[in-house]
């Protein structure tokens, strides 16, 4: 792995690894995708994008707006796309490297429209507002296992007033010193986002390109469509040097085949079409191979995100991205629960663990509830603990002369214990040590107030919002960013 000054993330190159496919199976998915990209192809709604495809050798039908992308163009684009790029934070200690086969990172969920708030032991659900974005950004700035910040909810209090998405760009950058990933950008406003980023760098566009503190996500429309907005986010992002995340939200049984392998083919075609557009626009553009693909529950009429299928799909996507040499960004830490309860804990663990073991470069979903509609700050704090435990599981059991401990076993002998050994004292932090998960006996727990996990998490949220200090932005620079 290349050396970097980035410290965030967790190394997935050693320890436990999950492999879902043989190389032949990955090739089969690839070749099936190449067939789909030629027949039926992808509908591209944006005239500028169609022209870019046409000028680079793709077959374009202006009447149907269908673009057919030959395999040689896909292969060329994949050769141009970097396998590694750095996401900068305002504080460089939060820089993260997105690298195929590299570290696993976590970010919060986005983008919901409601907040689940804990009040006097009960939960209330309210519309999300701009202040919620600021508070969650501060909480993520504190959370050691959240490596960068994604737009978690919409600022619905400024909806309809114009420039809602610009508010949703400025507020996070000010309230966290970690990198900001905009999950709901508007193509026609990308230049406004760029003005904010450039202002942070004193108007130095070259520095802003070299050290991107901001990135964007767009979603193809399943099945097999690139909207005008998606195309414009890709094109403008590529031209400005902004990292772009092409993320499919296919639904198995709804907008993609009911078989998960078939869903991966649809998903793959959608993501690759966006990545090809980025590379044809500006060769070498920084891109993620993204996924929020899941199943469609034919009985409930919903798209569950706490299901084992979502975990499997996200793990599969991580392997597809590795097959193509691209960094991956996948859904995980997800739940269909309405409040931070046992259902949430179970679902979040399985949907976090599977893609983590597959080596996904970023797993997003922390703090999310209710199939992605709702965000909970208490749940984010709990998820921070869950992630730390998943990291411990990822380590596996290292076997070496030191860890086999033959000398220690012989020294202690029969019937004694290892507590007094220097090795034991030195490795006091070796076992997992979650912040909130309670491992005391019942009597000690009861004596401290008998608080359940959500209550303890709420206390931590209150403490962080009151006391955590985010690295400030110089007043003159802040004024320019607001201009």
Curated annotation (Swiss-Prot):
Catalysis performed (reactions): Co(I)-[trimethylamine-specific corrinoid protein] + trimethylamine + H(+) = methyl-Co(III)-[trimethylamine-specific corrinoid protein] + dimethylamine
Q: Extract the InterPro entries matched here.
A: MttB-like_sf, MttB_Methanosar, MTTB_MeTrfase
Q: Which residues form a coiled coil?
A: none
Keyword flag DNA damage: no
Please verify whether the record's keywords include Methyltransferase: yes
Give the metabolic or biological pathway: One-carbon metabolism; methanogenesis from trimethylamine
Query: Which BP terms from GO are recorded?
Result: methanogenesis; methylation
UniProt-recorded Gene Ontology molecular function terms: trimethylamine methyltransferase activity
Which Pfam family name is an example for this entry? Answer: MTTB
Q: Which domain of life is it from?
A: Archaea
Keywords tagged on the record: Methanogenesis, Methyltransferase, Pyrrolysine, Transferase
**EC numbers:** 2.1.1.250
- The signal peptide here is none
Assembly state and interactors? Can form a complex with MttC.
Outline what the protein does: Catalyzes the transfer of a methyl group from trimethylamine to the corrinoid cofactor of MttC.
Q: Which family does it belong to?
A: Belongs to the trimethylamine methyltransferase family.
Name under which the protein is recorded? Trimethylamine methyltransferase MttB
Q: Which organism is it from?
A: Methanosarcina thermophila
Q: Which gene encodes it?
A: mttB
């Amino acid at each position: 792995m290349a050396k970097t000054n980035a410290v965030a993330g967790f190394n997935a190159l050693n320890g436990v690894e999950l492999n879902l496919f043989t190389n032949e199976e990955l090739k089969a998915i690839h070749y099936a995708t190449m067939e789909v990209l030629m027949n039926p192809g992808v509908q591209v709604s944006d005239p500028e994008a169609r022209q870019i495809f046409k000028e680079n050798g793709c077959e374009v039908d202006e009447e149907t707006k269908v673009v057919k992308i030959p395999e040689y163009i896909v292969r060329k684009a994949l050769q141009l796309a970097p396998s590694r790029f750095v996401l900068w934070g305002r504080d460089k200690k939060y820089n993260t490297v997105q690298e195929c086969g590299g570290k696993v990172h976590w970010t919060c969920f986005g983008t919901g429209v409601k907040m689940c708030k804990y009040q006097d032991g009960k939960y209330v659900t309210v519309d999300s507002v701009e202040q919620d974005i600021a508070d969650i950004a501060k909480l993520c700035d504190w959370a050691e296992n959240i490596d960068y910040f994604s737009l978690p909810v919409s600022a619905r209090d400024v909806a309809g007033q114009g420039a809602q998405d610009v508010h949703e760009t400025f507020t996070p950058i000010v309230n966290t010193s970690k990198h900001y990933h905009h999950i709901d950008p508007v193509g026609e406003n990308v230049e406004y986002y760029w003005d904010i980023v450039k202002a942070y760098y004193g108007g130095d566009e070259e520095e802003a390109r070299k050290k991107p503190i901001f990135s964007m996500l767009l979603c193809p429309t399943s099945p097999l469509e690139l909207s005008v907005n998606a195309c414009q986010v890709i094109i403008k992002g590529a031209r400005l040097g902004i990292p772009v995340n092409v993320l499919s939200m296919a639904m198995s049984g709804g907008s993609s085949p009911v078989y998960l392998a078939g869903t991966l083919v649809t998903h793959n075609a959608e993501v690759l079409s966006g990545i090809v557009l980025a590379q044809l626009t500006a060769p070498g553009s920084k891109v993620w191979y993204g996924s929020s693909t899941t199943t469609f529950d034919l009985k409930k009429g919903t798209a569950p995100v706490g299901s084992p299928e979502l975990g499997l799909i996200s793990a599969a996507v991580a392997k597809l991205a590795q097959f193509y040499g691209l960094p991956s960004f996948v859904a995980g830490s997800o739940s269909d629960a309405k409040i931070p309860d046992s259902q949430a804990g179970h679902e979040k663990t399985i949907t976090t663990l599977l893609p983590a073991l597959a080596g996904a470069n970023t797993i997003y979903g922390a703090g999310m509830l209710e199939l992605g509609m709702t965000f909970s700050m208490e749940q984010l704090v709990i998820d921070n603990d869950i992630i730390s435990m998943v990291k411990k599981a990822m380590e596996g059991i290292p076997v070496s002369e030191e860890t086999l401990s033959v000398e220690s076993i012989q020294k202690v002998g029969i019937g004694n214990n290892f507590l007094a050994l220097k090795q034991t004292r030195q490795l006091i932090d070796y076992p997992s040590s979650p912040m909130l998960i309670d491992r005391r006996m019942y009597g000690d727990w009861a004596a401290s107030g008998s608080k359940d996990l959500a209550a303890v998490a709420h206390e931590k949220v209150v403490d962080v919002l009151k006391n955590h200090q985010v690295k400030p932005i110089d007043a003159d620079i802040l004024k320019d960013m607001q201009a």
